[in-house]
Amino acid sequence: MELRSTQTPDILPSYWYNIVPDLPEPLPPMIHPSGEPVKRSELEVLFPRSLVDQEISTQSRIPIPEAVRETLLMLGRPTPLIRARRLEEALKTNARIFFKYEGVLPTGSHKINTAVAQAYYNAVESVERVSTETGAGQWGSALSLAGNIYGLKVRVFMVRASYLQKPYRRILMEAYGAEVYPSPSTKTNTGRKLLAENPDHPGSLGIAISEAIEDVVLSGGRAKYSLGSVLNHVLLHQSVIGLEAIKQLELLGVERVDYVIGCVGGGSNFAGLSYPFIGYNYNNGEPPVFIAVEPETVPSMTRGEYRYDYGDTAGLTPLLKMYTLGHDYIPPPIYAGGLRYHGVAPSLSILVKNNIVKPVAYPQDEVLEAGLVFARTQGILPAPESSHAVKAVIDVALKYRGASEKPTILFNLSGHGLLDLSAYTRNH
């Protein structure tokens, strides 16, 4: 069997897959604190009309504009599907391990898939600037590049712990022309209040979201909000990952997949790979085991409550029904900054609640060790976020050491760790 899939342009789909109509129960609406559903006009304060259309859509297939598709091709899609043969040999497992490698894209992760789409729709509607949050900086880097491509100004509020840990991501964002501020910042009322309480506040994604939204609301209509995870329109943009993988597996002669694995912060990279496999009844009615991996220190799915909660710390967003640790939860400053979010995408929450997706949590030291094992066998150092998926893959694969079964494991290597080297240096 070949170790690497084809990457011809026809592998990139012409549509996005929207899981909402295929969920096992209706998706609860976003609501106000009053309990009333959020109106479309209120969403349009934050997002361009086309993205609101996608957010509330019940169509399973949404066409990708040709301009977006051309940009994705230019930036390196489709991404490779690779067999991790050396990892298999090191683990002495009978399992076959494949990974979709999103780290080949210019900003080093899957985030560019939705950044391009969001920047395109904002540009079409003559938006002047987009404001956003970023954890480890992958999303901020992606939106900075996409904004530059489509002529948008970009303002990024970067979680302070990551701003200090990962200076090269800030440099990359600024190289693409973005303004980058450590969050909490002095640019917003939310940030100033938190800094007054604690000048050394490490920040969180929830706080950075609050700052970005406040910035948009006070912009006088010149700016829109852009986000890298959680909401439906973001997750459906990422479905290109799984749609490509299905085609590539077929071309490699792989007839079934037994495990689909990805890390989870808000849920976009996990959804991007897994949702097409869930919605398309892959394996003819014998679905794979879907494993969603989170940090032990941010156990939204494994220890959180399924209830309505704000998507941000200050309570500026509508309430979303999701697994949550509480919008005021401040995670410790772990290296996987992209996973430091208190909640989980509402659609993924439904899948966890209905036992379609199995959540697991791991401690940071075991995760980083798994990342080093992958680097030493496959030559790619994963981002700390992606190493969570690698840890789960290794645990599953070891169950099949000496076994008669030969399952196929597929996981999303959502990004490389070349701008996260301090995580591995300090751990080892």
Curated annotation (Swiss-Prot):
This is Tryptophan synthase beta chain. Keywords: Amino-acid biosynthesis, Aromatic amino acid biosynthesis, Lyase, Pyridoxal phosphate, Tryptophan biosynthesis. It catalyses: (1S,2R)-1-C-(indol-3-yl)glycerol 3-phosphate + L-serine = D-glyceraldehyde 3-phosphate + L-tryptophan + H2O. GO terms for molecular function: L-serine hydro-lyase (adding indole, L-tryptophan-forming) activity; pyridoxal phosphate binding; tryptophan synthase activity. Tetramer of two alpha and two beta chains. The beta subunit is responsible for the synthesis of L-tryptophan from indole and L-serine. It comes from Desulfurococcus amylolyticus (strain DSM 18924 / JCM 16383 / VKM B-2413 / 1221n) (Desulfurococcus kamchatkensis). The lineage of its organism: Archaea, Thermoproteota, Thermoprotei, Desulfurococcales, Desulfurococcaceae. It comes from the Archaea.
